[in-house]
Amino acid sequence: MSTLEKVSERIKNSLFVPIDNNNMQDSINSNEVSGQVATLFANVPLGPVDPILGVSTAFKADTDPRKVDTSVGAYRDENGKPYVLKCVFEAEKRLLGAPKEYLPIDGIPEFNKLSAKLLYGDAMVGKEKRMVTVQALSGTGALRIGIIFIRKYLPAGTVVYISRPSWTNHHNICKESGVQSAEYAYYDPKTKGLDFTGMINDMRAAPNGSVFVLHLCAHNPTGVDPTHEQWNIIADVMREKNHIPFMDCAYQGYASGDLDYDAYSARLFLNRGFEMFSAQSYSKNFGLYGERTGALTIVSHREDVIPKMLSQLKMDIRAMYSSPPTHGARLVTTVLSDPELTALWVKELKEMSGRIKDVRQKVLDALIARKVPGNWEHIVNQIGMFTYTGLTKPQVDILVNKYHIYLLGSGRVSLAGLNNKNIDYFADAILDAVTSTQ
């Protein structure tokens, strides 16, 4: 292949979009006719407001003293305040004065080893040489690097399947990475639980060798997870179809308070011999939301391809952001490499997940006490930060406009935003919303 052909192929496989000179000239001419200053950017459309962060922005602008924010997935303590974990605070004290030099392109080696070990545990023993891990910009960055790798090195036309519903950014990441995404059944609004039959049917109907994004635990936004028995059936079907798991690991330890229990599905796939991807985030379980700390791990059947895979991942990282940030990864490394700090972290995870479970029960009790129409048991049956309430869009509008309780239009509520001071107010609002829309 000639140099020109190589460049052409590289451009074809990238997200490069050539400038349309005709449209550009039309834009300039239009501006000149209207008397406006000419600009190349007149045809740039206004993008939609992010469905999650847009609600948070509206909350911050609201001056009503009763307002409650249950939109953004960030932990809050009983007083509704952001919480810095004690283990993180101690690690930060140890890191005072640490140098601010560039990290290697693939991040801190010890951080990468500890991240893979945290997720895969003893399941990775004997498989380490078939795994490659790189530090990434939290879960979003890990997903983005992984999806780009899929576009470049999996068979052309490989489709990435995402649960219906899912975290809204999953489809955005695929689109901006030049990869086609589709949906598979997941949530049953009638039972407010898992549509397991629909999920399995969609996996069987998907083309062989498709990629399935699977939430490790604490499914976002529904809070509905498969049982261990169901995970084993999912693995059976994916093996039959040669599908590739891509685990989105945002809540390990935060869901149940047990790091090993929450990692069951990832370790199952590894033990069953899958080639697979995993994207880890330390935003929730370490409270490092703004530090953008995460990791991407890819598992291969063969050791000899790992150096080549790492070289390509590093090329993509270099072109995207050159090298990852230091502070968050150093914090995680400091905690996970110190037995005392690790024990403190595990204790704090149990406390955070325990508070969320307590909020679930108190919300259910408050709704039952008010005799709110309907069955609300799903609130305690779901797991993790979110509950998929089942509220309709008109009911959500009442909560937002009348009660200044901010949540997503889908009815997803971040339970971290509720506490003993506002649960009764929240339940009163739901009673009004449900009864007034019947």
From Swiss-Prot:
This protein's record includes keyword Transmembrane helix: no
According to its record, what are the GO cellular component terms?
Answer: cytoplasm
**GO biological process annotations for this chain's record?**
2-oxoglutarate metabolic process; aspartate biosynthetic process; aspartate metabolic process; glutamate metabolic process
What else the UniProt entry mentions is:
In eukaryotes there are cytoplasmic, mitochondrial and chloroplastic isozymes.
Q: Its encoding gene is what?
A: aatB
Q: Which Pfam families does the annotation name? A: Aminotran_1_2 (PF00155)
Report the residues modified as N6-(pyridoxal phosphate)lysine. Answer: K284
What this protein catalyses is: L-aspartate + 2-oxoglutarate = oxaloacetate + L-glutamate
Q: Which UniProt keywords apply?
A: Aminotransferase, Cytoplasm, Pyridoxal phosphate, Transferase
Q: What is the lineage of its organism?
A: Eukaryota, Amoebozoa, Evosea, Eumycetozoa, Dictyostelia
Gene Ontology MF annotations: L-aspartate:2-oxoglutarate aminotransferase activity; pyridoxal phosphate binding
> Keyword Transferase on this protein?
yes
By sequence similarity, the record places it as follows: Belongs to the class-I pyridoxal-phosphate-dependent aminotransferase family.
The protein's name is Aspartate aminotransferase, cytoplasmic
Q: According to its UniProt record, where is this protein located?
A: Cytoplasm
Give the matching InterPro entries.
Answer: Aminotransferase_I/II_large (IPR004839), Asp_trans (IPR000796), PyrdxlP-dep_Trfase (IPR015424), PyrdxlP-dep_Trfase_major (IPR015421), PyrdxlP-dep_Trfase_small (IPR015422)
